[in-house]
Amino acid sequence: MAATSLVGICRRASAFLKAACSLVNPKDAAHSGCRSSLSLLHKNTPHVTSFLQCKLLHTTLSRKGLEEFFDDPKNWGEEKVKSGASWTCQQLRNKSNEDLHKLWYVLLKERNMLLTLEQEAKRQRLPMPSPERLEKVVDSMDNVDKVVQEREDALRLLQTGQEKPRPGAWRRDIFGRIVWHKFKQWPIPWYLNKRYNRRRFFAMPYVDRFIRLRIEKHARIEARKRSLQKKKEKILHAKFPHLSQERKSSSV
């Protein structure tokens, strides 16, 4: 687009020079106009090539405006829209940080477009075409965030040896729960800090009974989940006995 605008400016400049030269010497107007236009094009040729090279690096359309918040007009009125699978962590680990940065903004634009489409479908009380596209985009963005966090953690472990981005320690609060306490800088020493000294990183003896009850509750919930899973497996075995036999034969 920049190259075409530059060519248009060159054409207007050549036409202006032709008109000026025709006023001075009508006979030499055509020759001087051609020479001036050729000289302008010759001077601006590297700029045109540089503009073309810059255009190849762009990934979005300029002067698109608010149209990017809406779906492609080809998909308007369609009940189903074809879409690919979401990006997995294994695929994203093979990409560079620059590619992940570009992909994040592409997914962000796609998510904004799908959210606009979802809101418009709710307003018109119509089903959204292919709502799984939004789930795939959200999963892809979560995977990109996860891969970037993995790289940051690996770099921090290499440089400082710390697992967490902010240093801290595992401590027990007054309710007997083990929590991660984040360290922070204070302008005064800890033994002079009244706010810090009001915090209790220990549990009193009467809390032990409630700790035991909490552990029993958690164990009871896990046992209930396991029994429910076994009941579901028994129902499936009774409903599809041939599959259970094939599984036993394959395991043997």
From Swiss-Prot:
GO terms for cellular component: mitochondrial inner membrane; mitochondrial large ribosomal subunit; mitochondrion. Residues 230-252 are annotated as: Disordered. GO terms for biological process: mitochondrial translation. Residues 230-240 have a biased composition (Basic residues). Keywords: Acetylation, Mitochondrion, Ribonucleoprotein, Ribosomal protein, Transit peptide. GO terms for molecular function: structural constituent of ribosome. Pfam families: MRP-L47. It comes from the Eukaryota. Its main location: mitochondrion. The modification N6-acetyllysine is found at residue 146. It is found in: Mitochondrion. InterPro entries: MRP-L47_sf, Ribosomal_uL29_mit. Belongs to the universal ribosomal protein uL29 family. Component of the mitochondrial ribosome large subunit (39S) which comprises a 16S rRNA and about 50 distinct proteins. This is Large ribosomal subunit protein uL29m. It comes from Mus musculus (Mouse).
